[in-house]
Amino acid sequence: MKFYQSLKIKKKIIVIFWHNRLLMTSFCWNYENNFRMLISSHRDGQIISNAVSHLGIGTIQGSSSKNKMSSLKEILKSLKDSNVVGITPDGPRGPREKIKDGIISLIRKTDATVIPLSYSAKFKIQINSWDKFIFVTPFNKFVAVWGNAVEYNKNKKPEENLKVIENELKRVTKLSENLAK
């Protein structure tokens, strides 16, 4: 599996997942590399940060709109130290399931491999928020799908690279939805 091979050879890895599916992402992580999530410093981000810390996942405070340089430095340091960094490329404010172009700048700066992750469940609750945040109910069929590793292609335009990444994340999201039925 390309993802597992990337971990074994200590490549820089950024795992991306939609903002509405970040809650259960921590349960999908089962590798020896440390995992750190970029999480908003807002109150709701702090709740998530506290929850994932109990599962052994570190956090990087920041977002695409605040503390950009501080969080970028922390991401660069984490990747250099062989941590895997998790990012919601449509967060913290959307639009829902639309990747912002900041991820392209990040992978160009870091030369990281991007690996999409999505999940779904047979029974779930979607709350009425900008992202239609998903809560998975207990005692349920849960499916997580890891996508193909995507590397930045220097022969393509940045927006073409972004489309490749977004399409792969959408593919694994749709696949997880279908498998969870």
Task: Give, region by region, the residue ranges found by the protein language model.
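Membrane-anchoring hydrophobic helices of lipid-metabolizing enzymes
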Residues: 1-24, 28, 57, 141, ...
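A short acidic, often aromatic-flanked loop/helix-cap motif at beta-alpha or helix-coil junctions
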Residues: 2-5, 45, 66-69, 150-156
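Catalytic core of membrane glycerolipid acyltransferases/transacylases, capturing the structured
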Residues: 12-66, 110, 126
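Non-catalytic C-terminal accessory region of glycerolipid acyltransferases
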Residues: 30-33, 70-181
